[in-house]
Each structure stands twice: as C-alpha cells, then as structure tokens.
C-alpha cells in the first residue's frame, strides 16, 4: 500500500462510513445519488483474490461452477465455489486482465476471502498457479452516473456497455479494470461499475471522483442496496454451506455452466437441476424493524416451528426499513405470510426481481451456452 493512499484511507473510510449518514438530509442525498445520480463507494466489504500462473485458468476451471478457460478479457462472469456436497462456500465476480500474466481476479465477500483463498490454495498442488491477496495491489470502488463516467473516461477509451462487460487500461504503470455490474432493476436505471484501481494510484482516483461536481460519496452499507436489487446473491460467513447454487438463483443469473467439466459438488448441482429437486429460491423482499442479518431464519406463520428459509443479504431502503434477498421455500413464498426471525416478527413484503426465475427442470440458455 502506498503511503499516499495509506494516509488518505482513514479519510476515505470515514467518508464511506454509515455513521457519516446520521443526518437525514445527507442520507436522502446519498439515496438520490444511488437511484438517479452519480456516486462513488469504497467497496470495503468486498475482498479480492488474484490468481496468476500458466495454469491459473485450468486450475480455477476445475474448482468453480462456471467456465474459466474461455473467460475473455472483454467479459466478467459470476461463479461459485462449492463444497463436495454442492453447497456454496463463496460467490465470485471474476474477470481476467490484459497484463502480461493475464491475472484472473475473484471478487467475493471480504469476510470469506482469506478462508476461501487458503482452501483453494490447498488444491493447487503441482499446477502452475498462485493465489494472492488482490486487495494488496488494488482498491475496489463502486461507481455510477454521468459525473463518475466523465472521470472514468480519462482512463478508459470506452466504457463497458452491457452488464458484466469489462474494459481494461493502464493507470500509470499498473493495470486497471472496469466491470459493468448487473442492473439493479427498478432501483436504478443508470449503469454502475466496479473499478479495480491500482493501489499505487488509488489516492489519485479517489480524489478525482470525490472532487467531481455532482458526485456523492456513498457508504458501502447503502450502496449494497443496489446489490440487493440486482438479485445477485453474495455468500457471507453466516451463509456458507447453506445453499446449493440454484437455491440462490445462481444458474439463472449465469453463474453456473452445466456443460463444463467437473468441479467440487458438480454432481449434486447437476442432479438438482435436471431432476427438478429445487424447492427453494432467492426472492426480493422488504421488512421493517431492525436490520436483518445474513443467516437469520424466516418463519411461515402456519408452521412456526420450522424455518422456511433465511436472509441472504440486506441493506437499508430509501423510505425506511430494509430491502433484502431471502432464500425461501417456494410453497411459503406462494402462501405469502413469511416473517423475519419468528412468527411474531416483521412481515416480509415480496417484490419482483429484475429477472425471471426459470423452472428448475429447464437449463437456462445463459448458463448452458456460456462460452
């Protein structure tokens, strides 16, 4: 970490802290920036694993749920890492840069990064692949809006035009990547990006963004609201080994390739898909009260002794309460009387995801045909 960014990091972290939004008008301005304006958020809740070596792609291809060998630098992909029982240990956004060693990056929840990186490293064996902490070399920023795009245009000749498209450039003498994030449905019509900034130039990038007219700094806890509305689940420590990928719509959003070779848990994932045994799915919902925690149980009032699902992730909503992604039994969702934490807990008000949940007996074209 450069001394300049080390000196600036406390200031950036303070500006990105949820405590900085205790003022109601400030929080309203931040949500306005998320919904219709320009913003930057220090993605301190996201970890990054860098994978290098001649066998990096082949190694990851045999470990993850999606095709890594045919991952081009022009695109990013979602992928999962499963246990032998087919349960997700981590969910990734992955991309390959255009540096000489074509480094592959895996962005995941910060709390699971170290353990997952260590576990993956155990299986490298004789493969020419090395996993390192990507946060030591790059800072992740979530950005969006015209003011942010004007800053990005100084580094990237063309911005990614479609969800999960990627662009690459050189910032100073270091590689930098820009990924267009999945759309956030009705929460935001404008595009948003994940910018992987070389730590050697992080202070410069942060200053350019935060000094841009019309751009608002937003805490990651609020920026997570857009992640919730994208319907792309994030596995955290509290939810590791709780879900087969289909339970969180991972194959629907393109995170599973059913035509690639084997990986840990592949037989379970494939059997669940083709036998139509998935009876739980990811849904978008709203709840009042205190902030829901990942892993918190959901209860159907007609069967209060047996949880019908759990919270995957949650974020504050603009008009109060919290929007959340929940994994829930299909039957309980249809009954539409699900509560948070107990039969007397806050009721969930379900909303539409920005994509259609495909029947589990059908192989989504986006997953099967990924290349």
Stretches found by the model and what they are:
Residues 26-36, 81-93, 122-127, 169-183, ...:
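Short amphipathic beta-strand starts and helix->beta connectors
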Residues 55-60, 113-116, 148-152, 200-208, ...:
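Short, conserved charged micro-motifs
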Residues 97, 134, 181, 231, ...:
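Residue-level recognition of beta-strand microenvironments
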Residues 2-5, 92, 248-256, 270-371:
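Glycine-rich, small/acidic residue-mixed loop/short-helix segments
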Residues 216, 220, 226-251:
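Short, conserved active-site entrance elements at the starts or edges of catalytic domains
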Residues 39-43, 47-48, 93-230:
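Acidic, low-complexity central loop/insert segments
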Residues 1-78, 82-83, 87-89, 98-99:
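Acidic, proline/glycine-enriched N-terminal capping motif
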């Amino acid at each position: 970490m450069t001394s300049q960014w080390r000196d600036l990091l406390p200031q950036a972290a303070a500006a990105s802290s949820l405590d900085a939004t205790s003022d109601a008008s400030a929080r309203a301005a931040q949500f306005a920036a998320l919904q219709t304006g320009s913003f930057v958020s220090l993605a301190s809740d996201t970890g990054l694993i860098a994978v290098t070596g001649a066998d990096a792609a082949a190694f990851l291809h045999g470990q993850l749920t999606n095709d890594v060998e045919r991952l081009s630098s022009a695109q990013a992909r979602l992928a999962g890492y499963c246990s032998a029982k087919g349960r997700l240990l981590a969910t990734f956004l992955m991309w390959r840069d255009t540096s000489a060693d074509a480094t592959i990056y895996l962005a995941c929840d910060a709390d699971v990064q170290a353990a997952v990186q260590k576990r993956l490293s155990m299986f490298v064996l004789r493969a020419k692949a090395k996993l390192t902490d990507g946060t030591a070399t790059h800072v992740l920023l979530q950005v969006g809006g015209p003011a942010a795009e004007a800053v990005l245009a100084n580094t990237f000749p063309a911005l990614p035009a479609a969800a999960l498209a990627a662009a690459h450039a050189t910032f100073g003498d270091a590689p930098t990547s820009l990924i267009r994030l999945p759309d956030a449905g009705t929460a935001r019509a404008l595009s948003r990006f994940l910018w992987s900034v070389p730590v050697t130039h992080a202070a410069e990038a942060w200053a350019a963004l935060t000094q841009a007219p019309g751009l608002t700094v937003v805490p990651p806890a609020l920026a997570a609201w857009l992640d919730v509305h994208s319907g792309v689940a994030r596995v955290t420590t509290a939810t590791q080994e709780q879900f087969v990928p289909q339970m969180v719509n991972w194959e629907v959003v393109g995170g599973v390739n059913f035509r690639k070779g084997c990986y840990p848990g592949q037989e379970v994932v494939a059997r669940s898909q083709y036998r139509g045994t998935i009876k739980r799915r990811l849904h978008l919902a709203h709840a009042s009260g205190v902030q829901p925690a990942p892993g918190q149980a959901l209860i159907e009032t007609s069967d209060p002794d047996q949880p019908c699902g759990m919270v995957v992730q949650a974020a504050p909503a603009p008009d109060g309460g919290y929007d959340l992604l929940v994994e829930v039994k299909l039957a309980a969702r249809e009954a539409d009387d699900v509560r948070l934490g107990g039969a007397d807990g806050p009721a969930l008000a379900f909303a539409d995801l920005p994509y259609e949940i495909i029947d589990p007996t059908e192989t989504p074209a986006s997953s099967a045909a990924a290349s």
